[in-house]
């Protein structure tokens, strides 16, 4: 399971550290957060101590209503659990008992000036991105008519050359050769280029090209969701290719199924144009219209009418 240090979280989200506990060894391994209202009330059954703890205005005000002895006992018990860190929102003052118990058990206390809702949203989004399962695949990733298209195929089949033609047609390059893919939450696969080759594309016979310099910033995109996979393969006369489009094929990446279309490569076929059409067709399907199914329905209706004559 992936994890990050509390120190990295603190630096990346510009949080204020309120005690000097070493944060490099404190690890965060879940994207979920916990507001410990029940624990401050003395109920510790099912305490999600492995999560980041968030103290907002409600929890802070509740602590103020407790007498010193009770407040210290509740905080002492909460901090005795192995929590990764505790974050106080809205720039609220830190109760002295909280700092004392945090130092006693070596727990990191951070503070943010954002309101609690925005803080929780920001931390969850950050953790989902940082802790997301990741894989690197060989291919080209582009944004075509707003559809994230991952073009795959064996080396030398023409993926990069096709990408250049698509860029000339106004589409956006995300990554060439190596595509870093993250699973964000349960429904999204997001792809980007490794930092070292970002905006670059390799064309055999020419070399490395800087797409941003050659075509402008309007030809690139940092990252995109992956909606469709186009697999390029050499034409095989012994193989039967789908000519109607009724069969939906998928490829599984990081546990998610992504729609896949196989395009056979043959001289005189305009692959860039075919990929554009595939992207448009995919978008049309997602909007509820399936051309192949419509054709099949018409055909079946025609056959039924003829059989009744």
Curated annotation (Swiss-Prot):
Which processes are annotated in GO (biological process)? Answer: regulation of carbohydrate metabolic process
CDD domains reported in the protein's UniProt record: HprK_C
Q: Which residues form the active site?
A: 138, 159, 177 (proton acceptor), 243
Keyword Zinc on entry:
no
Name the domain of life this protein comes from: Bacteria
Q: Which residues bind ATP?
A: 153-160
Q: Does the keyword Manganese apply?
A: no
Regarding domains, what does the record say? Answer: The Walker A ATP-binding motif also binds Pi and PPi.
| Family under the similarity heading | Belongs to the HPrK/P family.
As a miscellaneous remark, the entry gives:
Both phosphorylation and phosphorolysis are carried out by the same active site and suggest a common mechanism for both reactions.
GO molecular function (one)? protein serine/threonine/tyrosine kinase activity
The protein's annotated catalytic reaction(s) are: [HPr protein]-L-serine + ATP = [HPr protein]-O-phospho-L-serine + ADP + H(+); [HPr protein]-O-phospho-L-serine + phosphate + H(+) = [HPr protein]-L-serine + diphosphate
Could you tell me the keywords of this UniProt record? ATP-binding, Carbohydrate metabolism, Kinase, Magnesium, Metal-binding, Multifunctional enzyme, Nucleotide-binding, Serine/threonine-protein kinase, Transferase
Q: What cofactors does this protein use?
A: Mg(2+)
Enzyme class of the recorded protein, top EC level: transferase
Region: Important for the catalytic mechanism of both phosphorylation and dephosphorylation; residue ranges are 201-210
SUPFAM superfamilies (UniProt xref): HprK N-terminal domain-like, PEP carboxykinase-like
Query: What's the EC number here?
Result: 2.7.11.-, 2.7.4.-
- Self-association or partners: how does it assemble? Homohexamer.
Residue positions binding Mg(2+):
160, 202
Function noted in UniProt: Catalyzes the ATP- as well as the pyrophosphate-dependent phosphorylation of a specific serine residue in HPr, a phosphocarrier protein of the phosphoenolpyruvate-dependent sugar phosphotransferase system (PTS). HprK/P also catalyzes the pyrophosphate-producing, inorganic phosphate-dependent dephosphorylation (phosphorolysis) of seryl-phosphorylated HPr (P-Ser-HPr).
Would you tell me the protein name for this molecule?
Answer: HPr kinase/phosphorylase
Organism expressing this protein natively: Alkaliphilus metalliredigens (strain QYMF)
Q: Where is this region: Important for the catalytic mechanism of dephosphorylation?
A: 264-269
